[in-house]
């Protein structure tokens, strides 16, 4: 049977889902709303419109055409926001460079992406100076100067400076229509093994992620919401999965936006206070730093809503945030998923639950957002029961998931084996549809034939008074196969012993909450927990150091 395909009139407009369409509403309805960069720069949406056009004209003068890859090395700024729009709207590809990678890895990603133009903030001149002769495809360097940044000696052949280029360019640019499946962005995953892998997204995918997530965030009756009265500040780097796609959402909504530059805790806390920030997103490490810094201790955060992602939200950290009035909750996804798949928003009626139950819901992986087909499956790809007990791998489908890794067909096939994107996260789903990740496939511990969730043990230890941070890893054991080891960072001036931690975890074993195999064999007190370039706990490194 043949499908009856809709036919269009000869004059009908086949509306492509292009990033430029996201600007139609804010440029009319929010012309006078502010976009702020640190304490250095303020502009309106009307000015943003002009600067996007100026950037496109300037890049055109330097040879950027449809399909050209433009790489950016900058802190979170208004310039990055301009690049988010101008570059893909030209039909070019925006590469957001992870500036926390090693120089060799940065060179690899730029070469692998085939970037021809590189925008470089002053702070990264030493890095680019050290790799410029290894950049095989870059033909044009553009300098991003900034007041207060120290200019190091270099021999980089800059063609122009960013603001000078914009000043010399027209405020009029006609952004063309083209296929909505055109690649818009590229960035590189930062796994703990092998070379970084290129992930890419099309205009259609980014528009659908933006609209769907905007609807999901606006839907709660109260709390865990993002609405047009909010003031937005990203605390996830703009080089990392488009800062979770939130700058696109904030711009569509036309809200006041605040870009903090380099993440310095006291500066971030001051911006929250002085600019009235009410909505952000970050990894738990950043939230922990903000709560602990001097400015953070005296800043009223009672109007602040924060999504935590990039790893589990320990209940201890969540409680500390809630005690400060912060409306904190989990968002889940990964680089390959654009990234958001689920949100841990409280359902209607949750206000009747006791504090511990509400805390538990906020720390879950959450419920899938609209259009996401998320399943937990066994090794045969059979879906498991939604009973809150059966655990398997999370696999997903959604219209914004990357279709593969750039120039890596073998890894792409593995990613999409069986027609679903594989996350390598182990989880269960309860009868209400809430997902709860129990571990990463590579981090789960098998002791005495029993599976031990490192995340569950971390969560319990994080609730012990005096614990600042914790990571649990498995080490080899002749008798048990593996045994859990807890690495603990204590709060300043607190006296806690190894036996204190063990007895705390043992109490949950005695009550039947966890297996006795989950009680750490050893507790090591450390000064800090190693992190990856995007702020996640680096368990591979920890295993190498402590196993």
Where are these regions (language model features)?
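Structural core segment of the AMP-binding/adenylate-forming
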Residues: 61-62, 89-164, 492-494
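Conserved beta-loop-beta connector loops within the AMP-binding
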Residues: 368-395, 429-432, 494-498, 537-538
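Conserved AMP-binding/adenylate-forming core of the ANL superfamily
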Residues: 33-77, 81-85, 102-107, 163
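AMP-binding/adenylate-forming catalytic core of the ANL superfamily
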Residues: 101, 107-108, 118-122, 272, ...
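Gly/Ser/Thr-rich phosphate-binding loop
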Residues: 252, 274-282, 291-360, 373, ...
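Conserved pre-ATP/AMP-binding loop-to-beta segment of ANL
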Residues: 31, 142, 167-188, 195, ...
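Conserved AMP-binding A3 loop
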Residues: 44-46, 184-212
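Conserved AMP-binding/adenylation subdomain of ANL enzymes
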Residues: 207-231, 239-278, 293
């Amino acid at each position: 049977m043949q499908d009856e395909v809709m036919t269009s009139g000869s004059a009908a407009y086949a509306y492509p889902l292009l990033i430029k369409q996201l600007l139609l509403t804010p440029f009319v309805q929010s012309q006078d709303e502010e976009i702020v960069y640190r304490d250095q720069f303020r502009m309106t949406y009307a000015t943003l419109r002009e600067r996007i056009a100026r950037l496109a004209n300037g890049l055109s003068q330097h040879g950027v055409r449809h399909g050209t890859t433009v790489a950016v090395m900058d802190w979170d700024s208004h310039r990055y926001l301009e690049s988010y729009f101008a570059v893909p709207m030209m039909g070019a590809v925006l590469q957001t460079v992870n500036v926390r990678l090693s120089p060799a890895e940065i060179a690899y990603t730029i070469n692998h992406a085939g970037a021809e133009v590189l925008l470089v903030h002053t702070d990264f001149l030493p890095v680019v100076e050290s790799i410029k002769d290894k950049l095989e495809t870059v033909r044009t360097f553009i300098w991003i100067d900034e007041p207060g940044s120290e200019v190091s000696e270099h021999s980089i052949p800059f063609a122009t400076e960013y603001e000078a280029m914009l000043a010399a360019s027209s405020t009029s640019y006609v952004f063309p229509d083209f296929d909505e499946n055109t690649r818009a962005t590229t960035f590189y995953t930062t796994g703990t093994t092998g070379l970084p892998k290129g992930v890419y997204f099309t205009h259609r995918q980014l528009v659908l992620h933006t609209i769907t997530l905007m609807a999901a965030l606006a839907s709660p009756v109260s709390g865990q919401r993002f609405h047009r009265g909010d003031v937005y500040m990203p605390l996830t780097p703009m080089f990392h999965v488009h800062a979770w796609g939130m700058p696109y959402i904030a711009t569509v909504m036309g809200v006041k936006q605040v870009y903090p530059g380099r993440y310095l805790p006291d500066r971030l806390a001051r911006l929250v206070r002085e600019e009235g920030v009410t909505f952000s997103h970050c990894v738990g490490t950043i939230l922990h730093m903000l709560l602990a810094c001097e400015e953070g201790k005296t800043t009223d955060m009672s109007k602040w809503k924060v999504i935590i992602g990039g790893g589990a939200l320990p209940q201890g950290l969540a409680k500390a945030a809630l005690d400060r009035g912060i409306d904190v909750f989990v968002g889940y996804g990964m680089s390959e998923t654009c990234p958001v798949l689920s949100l841990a928003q409280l359902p209607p009626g949750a206000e009747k639950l006791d504090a511990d139950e509400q805390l538990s819901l906020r720390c879950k992986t959450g419920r899938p957002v609209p259009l996401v087909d998320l399943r937990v499956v066994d090794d045969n790809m059979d879906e498991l029961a939604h009973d809150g007990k059966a655990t398997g791998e999370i696999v997903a489908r959604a219209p914004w998931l990357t279709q593969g890794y750039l120039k890596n067909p073998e890894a792409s096939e593995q990613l999409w084996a069986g027609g679903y994107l594989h996350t390598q996260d182990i989880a269960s789903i309860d009868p209400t549809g809430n997902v709860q990740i129990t571990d990463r496939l590579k981090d789960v511990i098998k002791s005495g034939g029993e599976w031990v969730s490192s995340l569950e043990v971390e969560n319990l230890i994080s609730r012990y008074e005096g614990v600042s941070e914790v990571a649990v890893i498995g080490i080899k054991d002749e008798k048990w196969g593996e045994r859990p080891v807890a690495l603990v960072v204590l709060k300043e001036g607190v006296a806690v012993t190894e036996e204190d931690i063990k007895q705390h975890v043992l109490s949950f074993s005695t009550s039947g909450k966890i297996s006795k195999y989950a009680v750490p064999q050893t507790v090591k007190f450390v000064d800090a927990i190693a992190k990856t370039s995007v702020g996640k706990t680096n368990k591979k490194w920890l295993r190498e150091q402590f196993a």
